[in-house]
Amino acid sequence: MLASYASDPLKSRGRLYKEIPTYYRNEFERDRDRIIHTNAFRRLQYKTQVFINHEEGDHYRNRLTHSLEVATVARSVANTLNLSSDLAETIALAHDLGHTPFGHVGEKALNECMKEYNGFSHNSQSLKILTLLEKRYAAYNGVNLTWEVLEGIVKHNGPILGAINEYVAEYNKQNDLELNTYASAEAQIASLADDISYISHDLEDSIIAKIIDFNNLAELQYIDNYVFKLKSKFKDISPSCLIYEIVRKLIHELITDLLLQTKENLKKEKITNINEIRNLHYQIVDFTEKTNERINETKKFLHKRVYESNKMIAISIKCTKIVQGLFKIYMDDINLLPTNWKILIDSNETYSKARVIADYIAGMTDRFAIQEYNQLCAPKFNKI
């Protein structure tokens, strides 16, 4: 049974374009299925999480596997708190749809290209994909998701109080997402499920890729404690099994902490309805202070030891060159764009041209971006 402060699909604020409900799925389940059927969702399997799959190996996480892992964590947490697991799962599945090829490196490169044209943000791009760029229905652009899902995608990291992305502001005029308030508890869960998944699994993939080793992990005292206890209990544990056990324990402890602190917050604030969650002065779903410190420490470790390692910097330089090279060549000659993209440009106006090109590049997979660069630019990048 859903809590009184949960997002109830029967009480959804609805869709921008009215539709007849289905009897065999609730509204959030319907949205989940629509997201899974999008082209953007399928393309995530060929987009980088940290390591470029076709270069580094087939077993590293990509944006699709990451999104699935986030969704499983979000669903479990929401279920335990008597919230809508369908909504939490749906937001989690959609949270990275707007990512460029080559992960955050690609996003940074594209944002630099777009600095004169209001920049680029993968979060805002997710909204644009789901409300405009996906063309699957005759009656409207996008996939016509419920208000609660769109709110969660835009605001899962918190209220938008500063500068508002151009497309978000434009969309908000026709479908007010209440940008200055917190999103639902389910959306907040999706956000922290993302943190849980990416720090634990980036550690795992980095060990497997030999970017870091167990000596490096000793820099994180709590991880070093895990290692000591596991080696004491399992004398002959293999390195591969050791990292899996570490990650399993880390995920379990993070989820447990999140549940306990969130229950405490709900009790302390005497929350009785969803509007109280939205209008609260802080995020109701959270970790304890100690665990937040551990998470921040782990993020700093990953940046220092992994994302800013010599190997990753070398890859980043090449990926940046590909994204920025493609942007420049399309800006110089729009006839190189596919016809269905070229016709979206408003009379060859520079701003419109840049936005369409950014949308096109953002939708590319790693592999397609490399192929396009090889075909249109020199020298060739047969490998990253």
Curated annotation (Swiss-Prot):
InterPro entries: dGTPase, dGTPase-like, dNTPase_2, HD/PDEase_dom, HD_domain, PHydrolase_assoc_dom
Swiss-Prot/TrEMBL keywords: Hydrolase
Disulphide bond pairs: none
Positions of the HD domain: 63-199
GO BP annotation list: dGTP catabolic process
Highest taxon above the source species: Bacteria
SMART domains recorded: HDc
CDD domains cross-referenced by the UniProt entry: HDc
GO molecular function: dGTPase activity
Matching Pfam families: HD, HD_assoc
Family in the record: Belongs to the dGTPase family. Type 2 subfamily.
Protein name: Deoxyguanosinetriphosphate triphosphohydrolase-like protein
